[in-house]
C-alpha cells in the first residue's frame, strides 16, 4: 500500500545521525518521518557510553550551536564530566562525558516525541523508490510505500552487517539487531560506489565482580562542566567515577594464543577497522614491544552494574576473552555479561557526495553517518544534522547550508570525506583542521548559531541567549579598552602583586590582559577593574581568549582571506578536464573521477598539484568555454 501522507523528508535509521537529521528537518518546519526497525532503540549508544573528547567534543558544541540534540541529551544523562587539555591552549581544550545509556536514550526519545512536524514509524526499510534520477520514497519490510521529496539514509553498521566472534559469524546490524540486507543489496544495484569497513566493541563486565580496591579511581571534574548552551549543571544526574587498570605480559600472551582463531588474522574479516580505535589484538600485534596498555572501566549507567572496559575491543573467541579479562588487576573474578565482537558493514564512497551530503547520482538522496565511512557518535550526529537541514533546503529549492573548513570542524569533516574519500573509518581530530585556533569549543556558537538561525535550525530562545552572550562579550572588551591605569594611580606594591613588576607606562586593561602572565581574574582584583554587570563564566572565557589570542587570530584571518577566492570558486558542471590544456593525465583522471564542486575541493584531492590549481584558475578566468 501507499501511505496516504506525503512527507517532505524521510529519515531512515534512528541512531545518532538519524535522530539529529529528523529533528533538524522538523525544526525547520518540514513534514518529516523517521523510520527505524525498532523505535525502542532510538538514540541508542551502541558502543562506548561516552560523548565528546578531543575533536569530538568540538563537533558536539557545533551541533549544539546549530540547535542539535546531542549536547543537551548529554547534560541530562551525563554521570561524569571532564575537561580535557584544560592546561593547554584554547584550541585543543575539549569536554568529555560518560553518559548513562538509559538516560541518554530517554532524553533523545523525549525530544523526538515532542518535536512538532515529526512522525515516527517502526519498520525496517528494504527499498528506495525513484522517479527517473530523483528519489521519491522508500518501501518497508511489510510493503508500505512512503512518499517523500527527499530521503536521508543513516543506516549505520546495518547495511549487510556481519558480526564476528572468533571464527563464528552471523548476519546482524549490531548485537541483538538484524542486518539491513535487502536495503544494502538495493543500493548496490543503483551502482553507488561502495566498500566494506569494520568496527568492534569490547566485552561488558559485571561491576559486582570487579575488585575496585586494586584499581586507580578517576573522578570527574569539579566544578562539573556543561555540554550545551541550553544546559546547566543542575540537569546532571548523580556523578560517579571511572576506574583504571592495565593489561600485562600475561594478558598479551593470552591474546597471542588466540591469533589462530581470530577473524582478523585468519582472513575472515575483509573490512578495514578504525586506525585510532584498534582492537586489543591489533594493538598487541602492532605494538609488540609494549608490555602494558591502559584500560578504562567506564560505568554504563546509574541503574546497572555493567561496565565498559575501554581499550579491549576484540573479536577473539569467547574463551580467550574470558582469560584476557581475568588476567588484569582487579578483574581476576570478573564475569562477562556480553562478549566483545567485530562487525563488518557496507559503506558508500563519500566522494560521490556533494558538500550538502546529497548524492551526486540520485537527486534528493542524502547520506549521513557510518554509511559515509566515518566512525563515532559525534561524527555521525554532526553529519545527520547537516544532511537533515540540507534535505529541507533541497525540497524548498534554497541554497544548502555549506560549512567551510575555517568555519567548523563539521566543515573539515565533510570536506575531507568528499575530496579524499576513506580507506578506513574516519574519526575527527583537532589536527585535521588547518585553523584550529578559529575552531574552538568555546566559540562554536559565535561561528555557527547565526547561520543556523537564518534557516530555522535554532529556536528563538537559543537565538536570544546567543545575542545576550555576544553583546556581553563585545561590551566587556570595549570596557577593557577604555579602562586605563597609570604607574601613579596604583601603589607600587599593588603593581608588583598583580603584574609581577612595576608599570612602566599608562596601559588599559585590554593591553594588560594580553600579557602572558596575567589572567582576567587577577586583573579584576585591581581597584576599579571589576565590571558593573555580573558576567557569566562563558562570557569571561570568551573575552579572555579573544583578547589573548587576537594577534594569532588576525594572522589566521589574513591567511584565510588570501585563500577565499580559491576555496569558493565554483567549477562548472560537466567539465571534461581532459580538454583543459596543461593538466597532466593523472590530474585529469582524478578531477574527472572526483568531480569537485570548487577549486578549493580540487586542491585537496591527492595528486592535484599547486601548478594544476593555478592552471584551473587561469582557465576559470577565461570562462572555460573551450574546455566544455
From Swiss-Prot:
Single GO biological process annotation from the record: tRNA methylation
Domain of life: Bacteria
GO CC annotation: cytosol
Keyword Membrane: no
SUPFAM superfamilies the UniProt entry points to: FAD/NAD(P)-binding domain
One MF term in the entry's GO annotations: flavin adenine dinucleotide binding
Keywords noted in UniProt: Cytoplasm, FAD, Flavoprotein, NAD, tRNA processing
Binding site for NAD(+): 273-287
Residues annotated to bind FAD: 13-18
Subcellular location: Cytoplasm
UniProt xrefs under InterPro entries: FAD/NAD-bd_sf, GIDA_C_N, MnmG, MnmG-rel, MnmG-rel_CS, MnmG_C, MnmG_C_subdom, MnmG_C_subdom_sf
Keyword Ubl conjugation appears in the UniProt entry: no
Function noted in UniProt: NAD-binding protein involved in the addition of a carboxymethylaminomethyl (cmnm) group at the wobble position (U34) of certain tRNAs, forming tRNA-cmnm(5)s(2)U34.
Family: Belongs to the MnmG family.
Name this polypeptide is given: tRNA uridine 5-carboxymethylaminomethyl modification enzyme MnmG
Organism whose genome encodes this protein: Neisseria meningitidis serogroup B (strain ATCC BAA-335 / MC58)
Lineage, broadest ranks: Bacteria, Pseudomonadati, Pseudomonadota, Betaproteobacteria, Neisseriales
Gene name linked to the record: mnmG
